[in-house]
Amino acid sequence: MALRTIRVQGDPVLEKICQPVKELTPRTKELIEDMLDTMYEANGVGLAAPQVGILKRIVVIDVGEGPVVMVNPVILETSGEQTGDEGCLSIPGKAGQVTRPNYVKVHAFDENMEEYEIEGTELMARAMCHEIDHLDGHLYVEKVEGQLHDVTYEEEE
């Protein structure tokens, strides 16, 4: 598979609303594999298709429990609240305090276009919200409470 270039803040593609995936083509499967490779190479916990320049509703996440592929994800339910540092591969070297739901339930399709629902708490809930925001042209910095701060490579999400 191939590594893709991660777009950084200021790139207009990050501000656009992504289109739903209508069918799973070989090209879309290749994109998903490339996104996973790119996320792991960058030591991230999540990556959305617009971060690699593709305006499709696809995200990949791995919070340490194995990869999760979400095609056309929709948040069904949220509850609770958590505030913590959040970073983004599209805003390297920075982080900021963001409040997100502590529980999230999402409806999505997997890499084979099989429908499923997934629940996440804590870091997984944060990652799901963060990545789905990308699909609607939003970056976490829009939600930061206070100022961004510098982070070392090991701390980045």
Where are these regions (language model features)?
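Positively charged
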Residues: 1-157
